[in-house]
């Protein structure tokens, strides 16, 4: 009976080791995906961050990058801990899994909360940002973001083209007689913003605010889904780790 019990325990331990190793390989790839989503958001989808009053969108992306890096390191540590059968390494591995789990839950929660608050924030701040900071010294990022927003989404002004009547730049001598920025034009040529007829500029119902809101919400959904999805998978990793730790403890005694 003793020999049978020892063989059963050893067999169970081996199975757990391979389960955890398989999990760690998948986990490492998941970490790469999480980091990629965070970097993708920062590098390619962050053009409009200067138009947002809150830093939540940016913070969420940074959390994903950090979580992705830690996940990859943890995955490598998990493989090492599994095959060396070192219980102290398994404890460290479990602790890191727990930290990553919390980071991804926070990222997902922030994305969800900001998703709910985005409409109110844009309504409160976007028009003011566009009219007061466009083409103003020290706000080159806002100017670039507004021009890209209006050209990429074929819109003009926060709510409509009339918003530009309140622009500090339009009322200054620097506007050169323009009534809207040139980026409002369907075909951008220098000075085209002097004529705001519908045949010349974009007059989209809802203005740029609805376009920007939809754009950011789509990416918040991706960030939230990735963060929470990987967090759910990690529960299995923590479970396998606990089982292997317990199995090694029983064999030790």
Swiss-Prot record:
<feature type="transmembrane region" description="Helical">
    <location>
        <begin position="58"/>
        <end position="78"/>
    </location>
</feature>
<keyword id="KW-0564">Palmitate</keyword>
<feature type="transmembrane region" description="Helical">
    <location>
        <begin position="92"/>
        <end position="112"/>
    </location>
</feature>
<dbReference type="GO" id="GO:0016477">
    <property type="term" value="P:cell migration"/>
</dbReference>
<feature type="transmembrane region" description="Helical">
    <location>
        <begin position="19"/>
        <end position="39"/>
    </location>
</feature>
<dbReference type="GO" id="GO:0005886">
    <property type="term" value="C:plasma membrane"/>
</dbReference>
<feature type="topological domain" description="Cytoplasmic">
    <location>
        <begin position="1"/>
        <end position="18"/>
    </location>
</feature>
<keyword id="KW-0325">Glycoprotein</keyword>
<feature type="lipid moiety-binding region" description="S-palmitoyl cysteine">
    <location>
        <position position="242"/>
    </location>
</feature>
<comment type="subunit">
    <text>Interacts with integrins ITGA3:ITGB1, ITGA5:ITGB1, ITGA3:ITGB1 and ITGA6:ITGB4 and with CD9 and CD181. Interacts (via the second extracellular domain) with integrin ITGAV:ITGB3. Interacts with ITGA3; this interaction modulates ITGA3 glycosylation pattern. Interacts with F11R. Interacts with RAC1 and CDC42; these interactions mediate physical association of RAC1 and CDC42 with integrin adhesion receptor complexes.</text>
</comment>
<keyword id="KW-0832">Ubl conjugation</keyword>
<keyword id="KW-0812">Transmembrane</keyword>
<feature type="topological domain" description="Extracellular">
    <location>
        <begin position="40"/>
        <end position="57"/>
    </location>
</feature>
<protein>
    <recommendedName>
        <fullName>CD151 antigen</fullName>
    </recommendedName>
</protein>
<keyword id="KW-1003">Cell membrane</keyword>
<dbReference type="InterPro" id="IPR008952">
    <property type="entry name" value="Tetraspanin_EC2_sf"/>
</dbReference>
<dbReference type="InterPro" id="IPR018499">
    <property type="entry name" value="Tetraspanin/Peripherin"/>
</dbReference>
<dbReference type="Pfam" id="PF00335">
    <property type="entry name" value="Tetraspanin"/>
</dbReference>
<dbReference type="GO" id="GO:0005178">
    <property type="term" value="F:integrin binding"/>
</dbReference>
<dbReference type="InterPro" id="IPR000301">
    <property type="entry name" value="Tetraspanin_animals"/>
</dbReference>
<keyword id="KW-0472">Membrane</keyword>
<feature type="lipid moiety-binding region" description="S-palmitoyl cysteine">
    <location>
        <position position="243"/>
    </location>
</feature>
<feature type="topological domain" description="Cytoplasmic">
    <location>
        <begin position="243"/>
        <end position="253"/>
    </location>
</feature>
<keyword id="KW-1133">Transmembrane helix</keyword>
<feature type="topological domain" description="Extracellular">
    <location>
        <begin position="113"/>
        <end position="221"/>
    </location>
</feature>
<feature type="glycosylation site" description="N-linked (GlcNAc...) asparagine">
    <location>
        <position position="159"/>
    </location>
</feature>
<keyword id="KW-0449">Lipoprotein</keyword>
<comment type="function">
    <text>Structural component of specialized membrane microdomains known as tetraspanin-enriched microdomains (TERMs), which act as platforms for receptor clustering and signaling. Plays a role in various cellular and molecular mechanism through its association with both integrin and non-integrin proteins. These interactions facilitate critical cellular functions, including cell-to-cell communication, wound healing, platelet aggregation, trafficking, cell motility, and angiogenesis.</text>
</comment>
<comment type="similarity">
    <text>Belongs to the tetraspanin (TM4SF) family.</text>
</comment>
<feature type="lipid moiety-binding region" description="S-palmitoyl cysteine">
    <location>
        <position position="11"/>
    </location>
</feature>
<feature type="topological domain" description="Cytoplasmic">
    <location>
        <begin position="79"/>
        <end position="91"/>
    </location>
</feature>
<feature type="transmembrane region" description="Helical">
    <location>
        <begin position="222"/>
        <end position="242"/>
    </location>
</feature>
<feature type="lipid moiety-binding region" description="S-palmitoyl cysteine">
    <location>
        <position position="15"/>
    </location>
</feature>
